[in-house]
Amino acid sequence: MAPDTRAVLLTLYRYQEAFSALDSNAAHAVWPSVDVKALDRAFDQLEQQTFNLQGCNVTVSGTRADASCSGSAIYARKVGNTAVHEEPRQWRFTLQQRGGQWLIDRVDVR
């Protein structure tokens, strides 16, 4: 595996861990353009959340990269229906290398 591909996958792992920990600051560290206040509000609605990104396909072109991952989101809300839900998800990431590290520019989730 090429070093840049490995570095992109590490960034995606950090994204997964940040969202699983409901940690908006950690999410901002890998996705600088994310709206931290909106993310805090969303995280405040959740009792727990786990993102499972699997089978990520990464394409690196110079200082840009695209990645698509399948997986699931498991979550429970604090209010209302507090049952644990699991939903399949597809993630598409656009990343850019800045200052020697790969950062997320855009995320599309379906």
Segments predicted by a language model, with ranges:
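Exposed beta-sheet edge and beta->alpha loop/turn motif
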Residues: 64-110
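Compositionally biased, proline/threonine/alanine/serine-rich low-complexity intrinsically disordered stretches
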Residues: 1-3
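Residue-level detector of alpha-helix boundaries and kinks
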Residues: 11-12, 80
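Short solvent-exposed beta->alpha transition segments
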Residues: 9-10, 17-72
